[in-house]
Amino acid sequence: MLKSKIHRATITDACIDYEGSITIDKNLMQAANLLPYEQVHVVNVNNGTRLETYVIEGSAGSGQICLNGAAARMGMKGDKIIILGYSLITEEDTLIHQPNLVYVDALNRITKVKNGVANQGLEV
């Protein structure tokens, strides 16, 4: 189940020579309930690529969102991305589960934190 989402964060750097991962500002990690080394999916809004990697904690308040290693080929500075974390939960907990959603501005400062995904009026 979706556990955490950082919505439309801006890539601040891409370091191809780093060993791998995505570095995320500690404040954003805490707001999204993401842990160091946790597996995440990253969706690049600009080019449509999707990747799977793990989180490294960046400096608190830095706004840092850095793609590292091979992941750096999937986006560039200024691209908008969505970072998704997942968890396994029991079937009974699916009835009450609400993901933690973090919204940020262009400098990756938190603008809103909420639980649950609102129905956006899309017909299925």
UniProtKB/Swiss-Prot annotation:
This is Aspartate 1-decarboxylase. The modification Pyruvic acid (Ser) is found at S21. The keyword tRNA processing does not apply. The gene is panD. Heterooctamer of four alpha and four beta subunits. Its cofactor is pyruvate. GO terms for biological process: alanine biosynthetic process; pantothenate biosynthetic process. The lineage of its organism: Bacteria, Bacillati, Chloroflexota, Dehalococcoidia, Dehalococcoidales. Keywords: Autocatalytic cleavage, Cytoplasm, Decarboxylase, Lyase, Pantothenate biosynthesis, Pyruvate, Schiff base, Zymogen. Belongs to the PanD family. Pathway: Cofactor biosynthesis; (R)-pantothenate biosynthesis; beta-alanine from L-aspartate: step 1/1. The keyword rRNA-binding does not apply. It is found in: Cytoplasm. GO terms for cellular component: cytosol. Signal peptide: none annotated. GO terms for molecular function: aspartate 1-decarboxylase activity. The active site is at S21, Y54. Its EC number is 4.1.1.11. Is synthesized initially as an inactive proenzyme, which is activated by self-cleavage at a specific serine bond to produce a beta-subunit with a hydroxyl group at its C-terminus and an alpha-subunit with a pyruvoyl group at its N-terminus. Catalyzes the pyruvoyl-dependent decarboxylation of aspartate to produce beta-alanine. Substrate binds at T53, G69, A70, A71. It catalyses: L-aspartate + H(+) = beta-alanine + CO2. Binds 1 pyruvoyl group covalently per subunit. It comes from the Bacteria.
